[in-house]
C-alpha cells in the first residue's frame, strides 16, 4: 500500500489535473451523534470537471443546501461513475469512528465499476485496507473537483436520509440538526432518551448517557 499525506504541492496538483480523470472520495457524518457515516467516491473526466467548475461547484461546506441539491443531478449526469458506502451506528460503536469511516470509504470504492489506480482522499485518514495508491489531501474538497463533488453527493444523500428519519424519530429535530450534537438535540436526548440510531460511543464520551 502506498499513500501520501500532505498539503498538496502546486506541481503535484498540476500533475493530477493533467490526468484524463480523477477519483475523489469524501465522507460526511463522521462527527454526528446520530445515524450512519456516509462516504462517496466519484470518478470525473477532466472535461466534466472543468464543466462543473464553470457551473460553480465547490466544497459542499461553502454551498447552501439549495445549491447542493441543485448541483446534485448535474454531478450525477457528468460523472463517469460514483458510489456510496456507509457504516452503521452499530459498526461505529463497535469499531470506533476512525475504522468505521475507513470501512465506509472502502465500501464506496469497491462499488465502482473499475478499481481506480489512485484515490484522492479529503483529509488525513489513510485507508489501511486499500491496496492501491492514495493521496490524502488537506482541504482536498476545496482543491480537487472530484473530492468536492464527492462531498456534495455524500452531504445531499445523508441529509435526505436524516429528513426521512424525522417521522420515525420525532422530537429530536433530526430534519434540522442532521444528527449533529446541537444544544437542542442534547436537550431532546435528556428529555426522550436514546434511540437505536444514537451513537452510544459518542454520547458516553460526552457524559450524556
Curated annotation (Swiss-Prot):
Main location: cytoplasm
Lineage: superkingdom: Bacteria
Binding-site residues, a divalent metal cation: 26-27, 122
Boundaries of every RNase H type-2 domain copy: 20-209
Catalytic activity: Endonucleolytic cleavage to 5'-phosphomonoester
Record has Glycosyltransferase as a keyword: no
GO biological-process terms attached to the record: DNA replication, removal of RNA primer; mismatch repair
Entry's localization field: Cytoplasm
Record Gene3D superfamilies: Ribonuclease H-like superfamily/Ribonuclease H
Alphabetic keyword roster: Cytoplasm, Endonuclease, Hydrolase, Manganese, Metal-binding, Nuclease
Cofactor(s) needed for function: Mn(2+); Mg(2+)
Pfam family, any one: RNase_HII
Spans traversing the lipid bilayer: none
An example molecular function term from Gene Ontology annotations: manganese ion binding
Cofactor note: Manganese or magnesium. Binds 1 divalent metal ion per monomer in the absence of substrate. May bind a second metal ion after substrate binding.
GO cellular component, one term: ribonuclease H2 complex
EC number: 3.1.26.4
Function: Endonuclease that specifically degrades the RNA of RNA-DNA hybrids.
Family classification: Belongs to the RNase HII family.
Name assigned to this protein: Ribonuclease HII
Species whose genome carries this gene: Prochlorococcus marinus subsp. pastoris (strain CCMP1986 / NIES-2087 / MED4)
